[in-house]
Amino acid sequence: MGQTWSPLTHAGAREAIALACRVLAHRGLADGILGHISLRIGENSLLVRCRGPQERGLAFTEASDIRLVDLDGNPAAEGELEGGYSAPNELPLHTELLRQRPDINAVVHAHPPRVVAADLAGLGIRPIVGAFDIPGTRLAAGGVPVYPRGVLVRNRQLAAEMLHAMGDRPVVLLRGHGLTSAAGSVEQAVLQAISVDTLAGLSLQVTSAGGALKDLPDSDMAELPDLGGSFNTQTAWRHELARISAAW
């Protein structure tokens, strides 16, 4: 294996993933103990949120809950899964994405109730808003694909089915289950999930009020500026971290 587990190995990345898990929970996308985030580390390994003997849920994730495993779920360094830690049952959901999508480095899997409810109600995630959430609108342009099976994605075959439904899109819904978001960074993957959840919530509100969902006109879409990564990701992420800091 070449190295021994230490909380100081990839310490910054472990802490970043732990904070991202807490953001998911604080935003209501990962209630309880379900959900996980991973980050590619090198060619054949990833840091992933694991479950230990004192599991308390994503809202209480610490850097020590983030462990380094290989693409088959084995410890990628000596001691990584010691202390009663285990990789998620749905690790193949992460590893198959990392195997097949070289464009992504981070994967988020969460169970947002509003996303599940909107999909079960037959409401697709569409670009129904404009400047309200420009990155979310662009993400939803053309719709967000759906993997139509409500299964636990616990093996490579099921993960391959999910990837087939996802195509080259950044997010896929899992019917009766949740969503998977993939991006170049942990922060971007979480922000994408938040945008999809927000659009799902708005869709439920609009239809509950008797309204009809309409896509943003192409002419309006063309007018939406690209505010750049420093605003769309970096500033937005500072806000998310400030929210959880204030909550604590």
Swiss-Prot record:
Example of a GO biological process term: pentose catabolic process
Domain of life: Bacteria
Keywords, ordered alphabetically: Lyase, Metal-binding, Plasmid
Pathway: Xenobiotic degradation; phthalate degradation
One Gene Ontology CC term in the entry: cytosol
Pfam family for this entry, one: Aldolase_II
Positions annotated to bind a divalent metal cation: 90, 109, 111, 177
pH profile of the protein: Optimum pH is 7.
Cofactor(s) needed for function: a divalent metal cation
Protein name: 3,4-dihydroxyphthalate decarboxylase
Source organism per UniProt: Arthrobacter keyseri
